[in-house]
């Protein structure tokens, strides 16, 4: 039976977002939402017919909120809004981000506080389910008043305007609709505002980054465990007794993950008089990785709330009361997404330092740069350079976006969140850090193969090593390889969900204790 996810505005999960955005799972409006949507719409129709003054319905927008709009112009007002607010810039957002945006906007609208027609929500849903993906430039949002510019680009194809992708081809909005067998619509009063006023874009991008960060946290524990085995690391820093007296959840989870991954390993040791402690990047993995786990768990809790929230303005209450407020303001997510970027950056930072320990012959006691006959061969020399470059770039990107604000709209919107920038930066940091972790895993596997005594790996690390070696080659000499290709293979392996799933079938991994 084909899976379909019901959207009721209350129960959408991060896993649902991933299923719809990346796996193409279909969704539908839950029957329980229909009555509230229709009731909300009737209130808007009454406002127009009674010529009541309500922001964005019978007035202009932003600093033009005191300009009255006649009932006969309320429809044109909404189309004008979309045409002029679609002023983004830059490369188009990727397909999974666009699908997540469409999904989260639908889920917010079906709560019944936005005064939009059910048929208009269903039109956006039809585009999503039939794979018509609006062309949305990545830049141009202040994160307050919501994500106006990118969401206006989302709406354009619904009107037969703008551009959209359909089956991998970029088309005009009207042509995409025609090929998908979808009729365009005209907007009614308030509908343009309802579709574009909200934190949907920043939330969608941040939600995808959060999900990927959770997977990266587990991969970083795996990478660290493999590096520990290369160095015959001391296992006492991961004993449960040490961490129960400082019961930080992420720290406890990391220590347990490392213990699980290394169970049965013959490549670890205990402290001796000649070697009392390992360096921080190995010994303090529970404290370093764990701090990022706690940060990202907090961010996920905020995402879970936001994907089921109303971020429109004004809000149409069930009793007919209309409230002009500030739920569109992205600050509640801008700060968490800045935090997300910092947390992921630290994972990349510590992984790069472990890469250095692997390629440095004085630290690893292996051939320089993990290759036979160093000098003639450079091996992994420049992979560490690349990791250092990415780690340093992350440090720049990790500067918080939310501490900045530029007033807009004739100073009516005088303090903005920059939350969309925060989310986009977090995703870039994620991509950089994932490449660093992939490099660490590749270097650790190379180092294990170079060890003169190759003992049994741990229960979890052996599964990972065996899977990795099916795709990524041992580098014997520089002459016969292009290391860039092998690095790309390494990235592809760890990004494939089946890799981590296989490890987790062997051992339990978690981000919270």
Curated annotation (Swiss-Prot):
The answer to whether UniProt assigns keyword Transferase to this entry is no
Q: Which residues carry this modification: 2,3-didehydroalanine (Ser)?
A: 145
Q: Which GO terms describe its biological process?
A: L-histidine catabolic process to glutamate and formamide; L-histidine catabolic process to glutamate and formate
Q: Which InterPro entries match?
A: Aromatic_Lyase, Fumarase/histidase_N, HutH, L-Aspartase-like, Phe/His_NH3-lyase_AS
Q: Kindly provide the PTM information from the record.
A: Contains an active site 4-methylidene-imidazol-5-one (MIO), which is formed autocatalytically by cyclization and dehydration of residues Ala-Ser-Gly.
Q: Identify the metabolic or biological route this protein is part of.
A: Amino-acid degradation; L-histidine degradation into L-glutamate; N-formimidoyl-L-glutamate from L-histidine: step 1/3
Name one cellular component (GO) term: cytoplasm
Family affiliation: Belongs to the PAL/histidase family.
UniProt-recorded name of the protein: Histidine ammonia-lyase
Q: Which organism is it from?
A: Streptococcus pyogenes serotype M49 (strain NZ131)
Whichever gene encodes this chain, its name is hutH
